[in-house]
Amino acid sequence: MTKVYFVCHAQPEHDWEEDRTRPLTEEGKKDSEIVLEFLKDKKIDAFYCSPYKRSMDTIAEAAAFFTKEIITDERLREREKGSDGNNHGMFQKRWADHDYHEDGGESIVMVQNRNIEALNEILSDNTDKEIVIGTHGTALSTILNFYDNSFGCEEFLRIIDWMPYIIELDFAGDKLVGKQEHCHVQKEFKGKQRADKK
């Protein structure tokens, strides 16, 4: 059995314009300590990650503890967002129609296809090992939806408030055989609020 620990990044600087280089807040850096605390008694064979700074920084301390390099994969990056793509109305539209995307943005299907392609390669290369994948809220949600199509907008809205968040998926080959949520830190995602919320 292959164990994959998906680690969704800690709290980032939401006002930072450039998505790829967006850093963690000071609070987010401190919250990242739970990642090492959780992983340190595991036998981690490899660390994979989105190339985005916030995801890499969330797992960096744990990778150093295990003296492992972080292997980045462009396909694991977060959803490309277009104009006004991160608000409650747009979340609902995208999860109601997985092919929908705003101008300049990616659909759920587009994000899912590249993340699952990367995951399948990682699973093929790491049979019966324990690995960590540094990820993002939407990217991870598309993976969870791939294996359980009941995972939708409400489930997505639940986990994007968790930064960081660790969930374990267990695989026999490329078949999912187990799932367990382990730990998270509650942080409200900016832009999540409904338009009618004061």
Which role fits each region the language model picked out?
Residues 22, 64-117:
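Phosphate-handling substructures
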Residues 148-178:
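Domain-level recognition of soluble alpha/beta enzyme cores
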Residues 179-198:
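Acidic, His/Gly-rich catalytic cores of divalent-metal-dependent hydrolytic chemistry
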Residues 41-43, 122-129:
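Glycine-rich phosphate-binding loop signature in dinucleotide/nucleotide-binding domains
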Residues 2-70, 104-109, 163:
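Active-site-proximal alpha-helix that buttresses catalytic centers in soluble enzyme cores
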Residues 12, 139-140:
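Short active-site segment of divalent metal-dependent hydrolases/proteases
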Residues 4, 129-138:
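Generic beta-sheet signal
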Residues 49-50, 113, 134-135:
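Short beta-strand scaffold positions
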